C-alpha cells in the first residue's frame, strides 16, 4: 500500500483516512522500508497533510502506544440507559519547533493545573530544536523519567500529575526514527505526538508552531473524540498562548470547532517582550519553573496563568478564563503548585 500511496501523493492526490491507517500500519510494524518511509513523509509534507490523513495516522499511533490507565470509568446503571462517566484527564502540550526558545511554559502549567484538582497526563520528550524540552527540564528539577508505565499510572492516580515520556511509550516509532533524522525536515510526525497521548487524555490544550495548523488540528482533535480542548498559536510564533501579542485559538467541543483571536489585555495582562519569556538550558529553565511555582511575579508568571486558565476551562474546572486565572493564581500563591512538583519528584524516586 505504501508504494501506491507515495505514487498518489506525488501527484498531489489526498489519501482517505482508511488508506492512511493502512500505510501507517505498515510503518508502525516495520513492514515499510526506511526508503519508503522517507519518501512517503517527504511527499506528504510537500503536498500538505489533510485532516483525514492526520486523523488516520493518529489513530494508528494511538493503537500502537503503550497504554497508561490513569482514570477510572464509572458505570452508572441507576437509570433507564447505561452511562459511562469517564474521569477527566488533561494534557497540555506543544508541537515544539517554534524557534522562540522560551522557558517551558506548558510544563509549568501542568503543575498549576494539577494543583487545582485536575488530573494531568503531561506528554512530552527531550529537546529537538530548542535548548530544553519538557523531559530535560523535569529531569533537572529532580523528576526520575526512567520509570515503568505502572509507576506513571500511580503518579497520575495518586498525586494527580504524571509525565508520559514519549520514547518510552511509543516503541513502534523506532521504525521512523532513522528516516526522520536523515531527511531533517518537519513531517507529519512532528504533529502526531501531541495528538497521541497514551493516557487517552480527553481534554487538551495543544500549541502549534504555525497558524495554518490551528484549525486543521482542531478538526483532527474533534474527529478523535476530544471532549473539550484548545489549539493555540501565538502570532509571535509561540506554540503557546502568548502575552507579547495576539493568539489564534480554536476551541474544540463535542459539537464542533470555533475560531477566535485573543489579546492579553482582554484578560488583564500587560504585554511583554519575547526576551522576558526566553529560557536557556535545562538548568536555567529549572530555576525559572521553580521561581514561577514559588510565586515570583512578572511576565513569566503571567504567561503561565493565561495558559493555565485555558487548560482549566478545557477541563471544565472553570466556566471562563477570567474565573480560571483566579484559580490558577491561588494554586501558586498557596504553595500547592510547588507541592505538586515535590510530590512528583518523591513518587518517581520511591
UniProtKB/Swiss-Prot annotation:
Name by which UniProt lists this protein: Anthranilate phosphoribosyltransferase
Entry keyword Magnesium: yes
InterPro entries in alphabetical order: Anthranilate_Pribosyl_Tfrase, Glycosyl_Trfase_fam3, Glycosyl_Trfase_fam3_N_dom, Glycosyl_Trfase_fam3_N_dom_sf, Nuc_phospho_transferase
Cofactor field: Mg(2+)
Subunit composition and interactions: Homodimer.
UniProt binding sites for anthranilate 2: 180
Residues at which 5-phospho-alpha-D-ribose 1-diphosphate binds: 94, 97-98, 102, 104-107, 122-130, 134
Record GO cellular component, one term: cytosol
Cofactor stoichiometry and binding remark: Binds 2 magnesium ions per monomer.
